[in-house]
């Protein structure tokens, strides 16, 4: 058994963990190689990006869509256009990098790495404030699921 494990370790330890991209290229040549070989040819429109986010990326197996921050959850019909459904149920799109700070143009506005479903009024309330921990005594609103309160919640 020891010989088998030792042999297996030997084989695994010398397997390449990654492949080299653009071998022999450095600096500007490597940069140009990466653009030529990996740059996307198209960018989703903002509407299409939200459709993909709502109906593919963040849609649960039970057709539920859970928002960040509050876990507010809605159920949508995947055979229908998701945006009218999400709008009607107070779910919209959070930009983790705010549009007001440079993410308003293309392709930034529709970059799926920075888009998340969220409860609409929570997103509006948050605005473009920086992420941080706020002392309860300095907080004036608490959100959870579809609930809102102006007083400190009980633990």
Model-predicted regions and their roles:
Residues 64-86, 90, 119:
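Short cysteine-rich loop/turn motifs with clustered Cys
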Residues 18-74:
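N-terminal module-boundary/linker segments of secreted carbohydrate-active enzymes
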Residues 1-20:
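Bacterial Sec-dependent N-terminal signal peptides
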Residues 9, 59-60, 85:
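A generic structural signal for short, solvent-exposed coil/turn residues
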Residues 83-155:
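Domain-level detector of nuclease and nuclease-like folds
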């Amino acid at each position: 058994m020891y010989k088998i494990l030792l042999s297996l370790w030997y084989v695994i330890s010398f397997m390449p963990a990654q492949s080299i991209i653009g071998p022999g290229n450095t600096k500007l040549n490597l940069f140009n190689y990466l653009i030529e070989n990996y740059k996307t040819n198209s960018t989703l429109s903002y509407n299409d990006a939200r459709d993909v986010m709502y109906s593919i990326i963040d849609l649960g197996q039970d057709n539920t869509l859970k928002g960040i921050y509050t876990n507010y959850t809605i159920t949508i019909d995947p055979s229908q256009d998701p945006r009218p459904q999400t709008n009607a149920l107070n779910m919209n799109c959070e930009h983790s990098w705010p549009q007001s700070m440079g993410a308003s143009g293309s392709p930034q506005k529709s970059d799926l790495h920075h888009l998340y479903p969220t409860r609409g009024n929570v997103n509006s309330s948050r605005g473009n404030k920086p992420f941080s921990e706020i002392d309860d005594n300095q907080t004036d609103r608490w959100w959870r699921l579809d609930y809102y309160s102006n007083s400190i919640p009980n633990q």
